[in-house]
Amino acid sequence: MSSSAIQVAKTATYLPDLVEVQRASFKWFLDEGLIEELDSFSPITDYTGKLELHFVGNEYRLKRPRHDVEEAKRRDATFASQMYVTCRLVNKETGEIKEQEVFIGELPLMTERGTFIINGAERVIVNQIVRSPGVYFKDEQDKNGRRTYNASVIPNRGAWLKFETDKNDLLHVRVDKTRKINAHVLMRAMGLSDNDVIDKLRHPEYYKKSIEAANEEGISSEDQALLELYKKLRPGEPPSVSGGQQLLQTRFFDPKRYDLGRVGRYKINKKLRLTIPDTVRTLTHEDVLSTLDYLINLELDVGGASLDDIDHLGNRRVRSVGELLQNQVRVGLNRLERIIKERMTVGETDSLTPAQLVNPKPLVAAVKEFFGSSQLSQFMDQTNPLAELTHKRRISALGPGGLTRERAGFAVRDIHPSHYGRLCPIETPEGPNAGLINSLATHARVNQYGFIETPFWKVENGRLIKEGDPIYLSADLEDECRVAPGDVATDADGQILAELIPVRYRQDFEKVPPEQVDYVQLSPVQVISVATSLIPFLEHDDANRALMGSNMQRQAVPLLRPERPLVGTGLETQVARDSGMVPISRVNGMVTFVDATAIIVRDEDGVDHTHYLQKYQRSNQDTCLNQRPIVCQGDPVIVGQVLADGSACEGGEIALGQNVLVAYMPWEGYNYEDAILVSERLVKDDLYTSVHIEKYEIEARQTKLGPEEITREIPNVAEESLGNLDEMGIIRIGAFVESGDILVGKVTPKGESDQPPEEKLLRAIFGEKARDVRDNSLRVPSTERGRVVDVRIYTREQGDELPPGANMVARVYVAQRRKIQVGDKMAGRHGNKGIISRILPREDMPFLPDGTPVDIVLNPLGVPSRMNVGQVFECLMGWAAANLDCRVKVVPFDEMYGAEKSQQTVEAYLKEAAKQPGKEWVYNPENPGKLQLIDGRSGEPFDQPVTVGYAQILKLVHLVDDKIHARSTGPYSLVTQQPLGGKAQQGGQRLGEMEVWALEAYGAAYTLQELLTVKSDDMQGRNEALNAIVKGKPIPRPGTPESFKVLMRELQSLGLDIAVYTDEGKEVDLMQDVNPRRSTPSRPTYESLGVADYDED
């Protein structure tokens, strides 16, 4: 297929760097965030005030990491750098200054791709969206339906302050949700006189009631106010004026305890129209008075005061890696401060050095805890390049300091008008996290304050100005402007053509003449996220299905031979490039060497730059990472040019699936309920074959009885089973293994106790010690097979870090090629998913008039009710493109080029394709878009014409091989003695309440009885049944299920006298062991507890 790509809809879409949000944030942390923390935390003085320790924050340095990225992955190490900072210890009494560079901990570094390597695994720090610090005004209804207003001052860290009005027109204040205090008490405690307050208010008459109320309570001076404040905030403690003063000081005016942050100061200044410099991060008297004034104006409905919408993106901000890491460093430094103060007190003042005072452990622990176990530090989704990119651009409302799933209501999850161009309205998970986890829109960026901005072109007097850089606006600023959508029609000069333009203004829609338009959106794609922007004809799909389409593209398995889509949207190249999966040239120059493992580019100065390629590496999701060069020796290259394709890429574009010939028609019921009928060609030609790499690991540990040994000498194993093992007992690379084969031979010493009787007998007769080791080898699990592609051995001698108690760790990587098969899940890009129900020989598939058999048959009933008609457009556009031998890029939302534009474009292309010689049958004017298909089995044409075309269909990661599972006998749960659940536990299928009802409805009493006893948790019964089946005897009657005994014990533990009786009223002791061969009962019975004697009385 020729690679000429036709751009159907021309819009200038220059996407920004898509991983910028991660990289910029980490750079900020290194340049500013870390220094800020080190500075804020020094000096540290001891309790006597003699010693001071200063950290010189801007003189910190990072050492070169011990391992590079690849080495860190291979050794299971962390890609991190050591932090050193200059410290000065000042002795106030002698004036002596000791200066020294001190190691304060290790800092994991971000890779070029925006990820972190922690213990050899690639992780991503997800961005968190939280409520911005600032002041918020809300209204509430009290019990009598009267509206009251309140104002909350929310800091970045520290106590919340909440002012409230009530039905008696009094003002109250709460500190951190404690009891209400008269607002004027707080004013007096802060040292403000009545006149100070009244002068600042525009409507002081409302406030005077609160002054009178305070006077009536007998609080007229600052001291009395401080006592009252202390009583309310610390009830039960003896109040004192100095205590009150200290409490107020530490709660709101101490920078270490209370911090509005740069953002909080900015928001408060903006809301209350103040001009306090942004270095003042604590509360000021002016803040409190202005808040009161605003609240009174709200209550009286004057002065243009307005309520805040907490779901507005102007009031929510994004915390990226840098800030989350900074918070964590602060936690570590606070712990360190305590340790330093203790050491200053304990140590000899004269001989102390900074290095003795500073212990790196608390900081290391805090950072490690964040990267290892924080909710926001996630194992990277590496299924394909798109999944990786989307993961880095994810924005979560969960996590520390955020919401919880249970508490989040509908309003938080809902789409808000301010999301426009900032958060994608479509891409979010289905299920409990819907709306709490979002994705950044394509053009959005996060500004210095953490608010999301989106770009616009300026409009002056109805003329669109596209010179220079677009203007980025945050949600707050955008509300004040009239913004037209990106698909307005303009003439060549940029003059807007329509007489009335729909614009968004203050979260509403109105129509205005072009002269009143302030800005125009940059591109139609800027509203949606990266994954959604890859869906062609998106505007014809229902949002629910587009959501599924976006999510399923992230689950597409990279195929053996990727093929880029015939119908794309023009963003495929950038997605592949920014995902970090494809190597990019760093210089302008010439390719001097290419092979499968490396590409060397010589720049204009004659310097060689080597790009090493990944070959068959295992991704986090067990898919295969492999890079193939696409440049040849002697090719000139420019900076930023793609040199090689990664997994799921072709020609530098993302290629998640295959373009296959699809027909929408029923076929013998095989595509009932979304099932999919596919041709054998997809299996034979390896169209949907993918490579999966599994990792198997075993460690040889030190046991009480001696060390475990990795060896070829395994007891009771035939020589042919050891054929592929080397002299150490480890499988050779390249061997083909099936389930049950030995990968690594290991023997464990066994003690006297775990020897079977026959072995004891042998030893008694011959006196020889049978080799007292047990086979504990690593074997291939059931249902798995494949070829060994890599073996890695880690020992302490080589300098590898091993888990405690382990002497050696061996890892074997096994690759398997998985062809498509019945039970695999496939999907299109429009949320049309299904399971393969049958693979037909190609001669039985319906075929086209020119004899080409169809590849996939989909059910036409899957389209109308789900309203994802985009798939039909894609399929027909693909059909035209395949016949014209080209590829097409369709930008979504094409109505700016005219009404019904998609339909016209597709039809025009189909007509164009039919003009080619011998291709007249491609377009049938009577049934546009449909063809007469012929039944492959009978050779007869079908009754009706059928929609046929090329669509991109993906194979998803939910493969039947990983899901299919059966159990005969296996492990049981300890308490209930029922079989475990799940494939990993070798579990059974649960026969639940509803299944029991079904059997009851049929009266299948015996079937039901054995399902609930012998096949489940009647311990003695199941052993006897197994015995009877093996010996061919009749199966004995079942006994009592163990879970019934557990229920009885639980009721007895509540103090209820519950027991089981026969018809004659005689008590049956279920707990007694019925097996006569074991004389000792397994559990204490009623008799042994002496209950029997008690009953006879």
UniProtKB/Swiss-Prot annotation:
Pfam families: RNA_pol_Rpb2_1 (PF04563), RNA_pol_Rpb2_2 (PF04561), RNA_pol_Rpb2_3 (PF04565), RNA_pol_Rpb2_45 (PF10385), RNA_pol_Rpb2_6 (PF00562), RNA_pol_Rpb2_7 (PF04560). The keyword Nucleotidyltransferase applies. GO terms for molecular function: DNA binding; DNA-directed RNA polymerase activity; ribonucleoside binding. GO terms for cellular component: DNA-directed RNA polymerase complex. It is an enzyme of class 2 (transferase). The lineage of its organism: Bacteria, Bacillati, Cyanobacteriota, Cyanophyceae, Synechococcales. It comes from the Bacteria. It catalyses: RNA(n) + a ribonucleoside 5'-triphosphate = RNA(n+1) + diphosphate. Residues 1072-1097 are annotated as: Disordered. The keyword Nucleotidyltransferase applies. In cyanobacteria the RNAP catalytic core is composed of 2 alpha, 1 beta, 1 beta', 1 gamma and 1 omega subunit. When a sigma factor is associated with the core the holoenzyme is formed, which can initiate transcription. Belongs to the RNA polymerase beta chain family. DNA-dependent RNA polymerase catalyzes the transcription of DNA into RNA using the four ribonucleoside triphosphates as substrates. GO terms for biological process: DNA-templated transcription. InterPro entries: DNA-dir_RNA_pol_bsu_ext_1_sf, DNA-dir_RNA_pol_bsu_external_1, DNA-dir_RNA_pol_su2, DNA-dir_RNAP_su2_dom, DNA-dir_RNAP_su2_hyb_sf, RNA_pol_bsu_bac, RNA_pol_bsu_CS, RNA_pol_bsu_protrusion. This is DNA-directed RNA polymerase subunit beta.
